Amino acid sequence: MAASIPSDLRNLRACLLCSLIKSVDAFQTDGCENCDEVLHLKGDEEKVYDCTSANYDGMIAAMSNDDSWVCKWQKMQRRVKGIYAISVSGSLPSNVVSDLKSMGVRYKANQRDYSIQAKK
C-alpha cells in the first residue's frame, strides 16, 4: 500500500502522529494510511485539521522504506510509501492523546518538532 503523492504543493498538511504529507482533501477522502486505525481522519474534516499541521519542514520521498538509511534515521521503516515531513510543528489535542493512550499507542508530543528541540 502507498499513500497518494501530492500533485500540488499548496494546502498540504502533515499528520501529527506519523508525519505523512497529503492534501486536506486526501486526508478527508482516504484518512492517513499509517494512522487511520487510531486517528479516524477519513471523512472527518474537523479531525483532519486537529490531527494534522500545515507547519512542517522538509520532505522525504519514502519509496523503499526497508532499504533506505533515511527511513531508518527517521524511524519510518514500517510506514507506507509516500511523502513525509522531516519535522512537524504542533501536537495532537488532549482528547486524541487520551484516546491513543487508552488504545496502547505511545505518543510523545512534539517528537518530530525539531524547531522546539533546537531552542532547548
Curated annotation (Swiss-Prot):
Annotated segments matching region Interaction with spt-5: 1-39
Record GO cellular component, one term: DSIF complex
InterPro entries: RPABC4/Spt4, Spt4, Spt4/RpoE2_Znf, Spt4_sf
C4-type zinc finger locations on the chain: 15-35
Top-level taxon in the UniProt lineage: Eukaryota
Compartments, record wording: Nucleus
SUPFAM superfamilies, per database record: RNA polymerase subunits
Alphabetical GO biological process terms: regulation of DNA-templated transcription; transcription elongation by RNA polymerase II; transcription elongation-coupled chromatin remodeling
GO terms, molecular function: RNA polymerase II complex binding; zinc ion binding
Keyword check for Repressor: yes
CDD domains: Spt4
Assigned keywords, A-Z: Activator, Metal-binding, Nucleus, Repressor, Transcription, Transcription regulation, Zinc, Zinc-finger
Subunit structure: Interacts with spt-5 to form DSIF. DSIF interacts with RNA polymerase II and with the positive transcription elongation factor b complex (P-TEFb complex), which is composed of cdk-9 and cyclin-T.
Function field: May function as a component of the DRB sensitivity-inducing factor complex (DSIF complex), which regulates transcription elongation by RNA polymerase II. DSIF may enhance transcriptional pausing at sites proximal to the promoter, which may in turn facilitate the assembly of an elongation competent RNA polymerase II complex.
Family: Belongs to the SPT4 family.
UniProt-recorded name of the protein: Transcription elongation factor SPT4
Native species: Caenorhabditis briggsae
